[in-house]
A protein has these predicted regions:
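Alpha-helical transmembrane segments of multi-pass small-molecule/ion transporters
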Residues: 1-307
Length: 307
């Protein structure tokens, strides 16, 4: 229970702390740096990934193709088409688009699948491969959408190179370290490093964007939460429909829905930094979306255990 609550409670404390006293967050941003925190997150995430447990079959390949196509590309364009005509603050629009384009979380999606009695192995496969595919889709999708929405001047090639250096390489290096060096003495406390780094990222982003965030009306926050709710439910419904078309089992469907529809706040915050939006309010929709997702998925996962 402590580990499950560590990230959401930690992010909540970080947000309140950074808005009340931004000095700690500004210190993290200035002297530790967001790239170092991102590398730490994915270095340890690589140690947690279990590539050897993945199983390939026809349904997995089809789920990978159609599921990733929707959640990594289609959902983002749906969000852009829906929100672009509204008079949104550009930073908030950018943050929501980043979250919609993000791959699944590296942990909570699997936890929710397991909680719902879904196919945990398929959820692991979806998590690993969606995150790898996202290395390619994120710079392409966000490079187009953020520029088209005038929400940021994004260089797709630069973004791709930074994703390789700060996400993909640390992920595989971490996997190699766990497999060949720390195989017998990996301590579970190491699992808290990416969680702590994500909290520090939140602290840094909210401290840097404090003035912009405090200027956001409460009504706008509620609108962002409502938009996040609509898009998350839409994503889960679409993935449920895809799984039915592919005639997947109930357990596989649960993995598709709970894992495929989950969005990684860690990756979203990393993308906010890489896209040069770290000093704006772009992190706000990411964290609001993440908090709403955690609550809604926990409720639905417990309900889904009946089926």
């Amino acid at each position: 229970m402590f580990k499950k609550l560590f990230l959401p409670v930690g992010i909540l404390i970080a947000v309140i702390w950074s808005l009340a006293a931004p000095a700690a967050g500004l210190f993290c941003k200035e002297y530790i740096g967001t790239p170092a925190m991102i590398v730490a997150i994915f270095l340890v995430s690589g140690m947690q990934v279990k590539f050897n447990e993945l199983k390939f079959d026809r349904k997995f390949v089809l789920a990978l193709i159609f599921g990733s196509g929707f959640t990594l590309v289609g959902l983002s364009f749906c969000g852009w088409l829906t929100l672009n005509w509204m008079n949104w603050d550009k930073a908030l629009l950018a943050g929501l688009l980043v979250m919609l384009a993000a791959p699944p979380t590296l942990s909570s999606g699997i936890v929710m699948t397991n909680q719902s009695n879904g196919n945990m192995m398929l959820s692991i496969a979806i998590t690993v491969f969606y995150n790898l595919i996202a290395i390619v889709t994120l710079p392409l999708v966000l490079g187009f959408l953020l520029n088209a929405a005038a929400a940021g001047n994004v260089d797709s090639w630069k973004m791709f190179k930074q994703l390789i250096l700060t996400v993909m390489l640390p992920l595989f290096i971490g996997y190699g370290i766990k497999k060949y060096i720390m195989k017998s003495f990996y301590h579970k406390l190491i699992d808290y490093i990416p969680l702590t780094a994500t909290i520090m990222l939140s602290l840094a982003f909210f401290a840097a964007a404090r003035e912009s965030i405090l200027a956001i009306p409460i009504v706008t926050v509620l609108v962002v939460l409502f938009a996040a709710l609509i898009f998350h439910i839409f994503s889960m419904a679409a993935l449920w429909f895809i799984s039915k078309v592919l005639r997947m089992s109930v357990a596989d469907t649960k993995a598709m829905v709970f894992c495929g529809a989950s969005k990684s706040a860690t990756m979203a915050l990393a993308m906010v930094a890489i896209a040069g939006l770290g000093s704006s309010a772009a992190a706000v929709p990411c964290l609001l979306f993440y908090a709403l997702q955690l609550f809604l998925d926990a409720v639905l996962a417990n309900y889904a255990r009946r089926f």
